[in-house]
Structures are given as structure tokens and as C-alpha cells.
């Protein structure tokens, strides 16, 4: 059996938090029609409850992302790896900022745009993260 290490903990926390952040958004998107059918307040109640979990996951992503950078030493990676990292960091910022706008939205347009941008940027960050993790070192 492979050894259990701090790298295992770091990656477990990072991947689990990403699953909560992005997977939760996908789940709420899928449940939205059902929630709307239950009552006009049901989507808001579900979103408020998810917010606590989601933002906690985002903090874990941020902290473990920094931990990942310290473990990988980007300075020793090639240009393509660092460009991919830069794009991932932009997507992480975009998903967080868009989610904040979504959470504080007072109009349907901002609510929809914030949710859509947050989800797409989150999915892009996951894809870019997989590219970084699977790149030859």
C-alpha cells in the first residue's frame, strides 16, 4: 500500500472542497425547477443553506491552493505550466467574485449572470487544475 502523507491530506482537502463548491452549484442548478415548484421561497432557502457550506469550501480551496503552490514550486515548472496556473487562478477569482455577486443579487439579471459565470469559471478552474496535476514534471 502507498504511504499516507501530508500530500494526501492536502490533495484530499483540495479535491473535496472543489467537489463541494462546483458540485454543489451543479446540484442546485439541477434542483432549481423542483425547488421552484415547492414554493417561491424554497430556492432562496436552499441557496442560503448552501452558501454556508459553499463559502467554507471556497476558503478550504484557497488555503489548500496556496499549500499546493508551496508544494509544487511553480518557479521550477515550465512556461506552459505557469500560464495554465495563471489561467486557473483567474478562473478561481472569477468564480468567487461571480458567486459573491450572485449571493448578494437584488435583480434577476445579476442573480442569473452571477450564478452562470461562477459555475462556468468553477468548471474551468477544475479542468485547468486537472491539467496542472497531470502535466509531466
Feature names for model-found ranges:
Residues 1-137:
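Polytopic transmembrane helical bundles with strong interfacial aromatic enrichment
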Amino acid at each position: 500500500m502507498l504511504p499516507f502523507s501530508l500530500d494526501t491530506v492536502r490533495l484530499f482537502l483540495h479535491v473535496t472542497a472543489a467537489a463541494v463548491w462546483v458540485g454543489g452549484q451543479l446540484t442546485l442548478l439541477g434542483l432549481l425547477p423542483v425547488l421552484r415548484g415547492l414554493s417561491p421561497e424554497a430556492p432562496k432557502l436552499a441557496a442560503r443553506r448552501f452558501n454556508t457550506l459553499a463559502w467554507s469550501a471556497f476558503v478550504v480551496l484557497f488555503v489548500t491552493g496556496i499549500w499546493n503552490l508551496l508544494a509544487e514550486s511553480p518557479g521550477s515548472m515550465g512556461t506552459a505550466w505557469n500560464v495554465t496556473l495563471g489561467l486557473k487562478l483567474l478562473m478561481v477569482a472569477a468564480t468567487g467574485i461571480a458567486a459573491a455577486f450572485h449571493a448578494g443579487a437584488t435583480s434577476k439579471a445579476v442573480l442569473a449572470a452571477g450564478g452562470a459565470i461562477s459555475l462556468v469559471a468553477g468548471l474551468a478552474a477544475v479542468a485547468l487544475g486537472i491539467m496542472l496535476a497531470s502535466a509531466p514534471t
